[in-house]
Amino acid sequence: MKNIIFFDTETTGNTNNDFLCQIAYKNGEETFENLYNPGIKIPPEASAVHHVSNKMVENKEKFSESKDYKKIKELFEDPNTVVVAHNVLFDLMIIEKENIKPKNFICTLRVARDLDKEGKIDRYNLQYLRYLLEIEVNAQAHDALGDVLVLEKLFERLKNKIKENENLDDQQAIEKMIEISSHPSIFKTINFGKHVGKKLEDIAKEDKGYLEWLLNEKLKGEAPDEDWIYTLKHYLNK
């Protein structure tokens, strides 16, 4: 049986140029959370989301130089470990900058989107799903450990749904989640811009130029947006 580790990072922003300032994980009954100096200033826009300030990290060690680094690297890179995060590609990008490269991962965002076959869910961010699915947990939103506790409950809900839908046992459901997480997922509706709330397949027929423009914007973006790029190419038949 694979060892499941739920984790979350808080960072200086959401682009390729940003760095880790907090990491939290849950491994069985063990929970861990700590702050680190990211080596660059945390902008107020980021602090407003996760409430980690420059003053809180100014005397902290860099993550790669900390006493925690070796243990976390060994734990996350163990071939028997599956790391789980919401929008895991971003968290993987952040920890790969610290030379931590997990072998196996599950993205609860991609799994949630895959299970929503009819595209009925408006958005898939962690806190939205928490309240939509009425997940009961005593956790602070946008705090790394708080997000991890919500993540664990969401993972269990999604795993049980896959088990029920496909008549699988626990291990088979986990393998299915790994498989779903390994490739881009397709958005079915759009929740921003002039076509907010519309099906993407309808927009492709009515306003193909908008999707062409959006694809170009996503390709130029600084943050990884693999799912949107894959989705837009799908609807544009590229």
Spell out what each predicted region is.
Residues R157-K238:
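Acidic two-metal-ion nuclease catalytic site recognized across multiple nuclease folds
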Residues N104-L115:
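A short, structured active-site edge motif that brings together acidic residues
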Residues V82-L89, M93-I94, E98, Y124-T189:
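Acidic, Mg2+-coordinating catalytic module of metal-dependent nucleases/exonucleases
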Residues T12, K55, F90-D91, V111, ...:
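General alpha-helical segment detector with a strong preference for membrane-spanning helices
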Residues M1-N104, E118-H142:
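Conserved non-catalytic scaffold segment of RNase H-like nuclease domains
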